[in-house]
């Protein structure tokens, strides 16, 4: 596994990001020296279709350990029906953070467009896919 929790362990990694209220005490991190690291997590299965295109918000935080000099890029994707890297499912939304420079946690809060929200057909099968690239 190329992702670790806040104590540099790959055991119980989901426990570091499973809160419903933001906590910066625990987190996940890509392993040092890895050119590309992919982490995928399924969103809670209790999400119900809100029958609305409004207020579909994705929130996450990111930062860089500035002790390393390498450029770090981060890609965050919302996917539906992800199975594996060979079966990525449907891309609903994506963003790129190029050349992260700050060691201070930055909070991203992205509201899906109506078109993106309406393209979700299975709320019980949504995944966040995170790619860390060291350049």
Regions found by a protein language model. Give the residues of each.
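Short beta-strands within extracellular/lumenal beta-sheet-rich domains
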Residues: 24-51, 108-112
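Beta-strand acidic-aromatic groove motif in beta-rich domains, primarily in extracellular
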Residues: 67-78
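Predominantly extracellular/luminal cell-surface or secreted proteins
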Residues: 77-83, 131
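Extracellular carbohydrate recognition and processing domains
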Residues: 88-118
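Short beta-strand-plus-loop segments that form exposed binding edges in beta-rich domains
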Residues: 129-135
